[in-house]
């Protein structure tokens, strides 16, 4: 994270404010604005940790606040410790401690042994904007609280941020869900991350998700999520991109398209390439359409790039998809409350029936993709190359970026889609 101080704004400030609140050091509700109340809360936290109370969030403060950023503490066992005393000290549940430490024998705790202790809040926040730093902390937190979750970086963005893939389950049916191909559609990232945490928690607790036992879902399916395809672009939109050459270059690109609001109208990666127009499925047609619309150079949106799969983020997802060979993909976008399920005249077996199911449980319409947007997308490429069901889900209504006030309705509409897609029913 960047150094944050009075006057700083953006997603990283909101993340810090969330962590201070979790650590019970007060401050305002997370609003992404580093004002006097936030400074006072940070100073109180710094004093409690023996740090210089300068009210500046730097590396030392970030390390001290890490348990509340990632959702767990690491405790070194001392003589006299028990699971009950640890649960009381950290306000943690015994079940959560046991889930995070599957090899643990609670009757033979050894001094010097290290345990992961989940803290009493969800790892995934749904009330603040997302950014790459929050994604990294959430990956860290979920993989430590639920060791069966596998995480890997499938590639790097233009600015070398990891593009994470998270996998859970051991079933024969492999499915792949992605989100935030487009920077100003970042609200789809917490959608996938909340689904993942909900599924993991339900599995550990023996509970259901959308009426299906989580244990059965993970027995029948292997779910892989790529929740943040465009980390650099999301950082730009949510105010987490540091000052420097990349931000200056993006501003110069945006200045060439004054009709597009900046940064809220930014969909592309940080180099001005639209990641969902990068796939070799009618790419030349997409190029002709978008060039005719004036997007013939790096732009905040709709520039197809110099050739297919030249943007590192799209290339990474395509290569990963080919290696995974999934039975189905969902690509999450905003907005329109609509499901796009076809590419040209391709209609993979079972795809219409699933689209009808998704529409029924979500209340979304299912439609053919409009011609001008119907080429070079990830879903298009998957259907063309794999002849299997692929869907673009356009969540919510309004102007991107959608406000977080829509998150709960988006969550309610998509819980069934995410579950039925895994099960294939």
What are these regions (language model features)?
Residues 8-18, 31-37, 67-91, 113, ...:
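Primarily a LysM-type cell-wall glycan-binding module
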Residues 1-2, 18-31:
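Extracellular-facing binding/remodeling surfaces
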Residues 3, 85, 96, 116-162:
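Short glycine- and acidic-rich boundary segments immediately preceding or forming the N-terminal edge
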Residues 164-172, 180:
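Short beta-strand-to-loop junctions in surface cap/lid or active-site-entrance loops
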Residues 172, 186-196, 200-340, 348:
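Active-site/substrate-binding loop(s) of hydrolase catalytic cores
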Residues 279-425:
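Metallocarboxypeptidase
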Residues 42, 97:
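Conserved hydrophobic/aromatic packing and binding residues within compact polymer-binding modules
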Residues 29-39, 54-58:
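A glycine-rich, coil/turn loop motif that links secondary-structure elements
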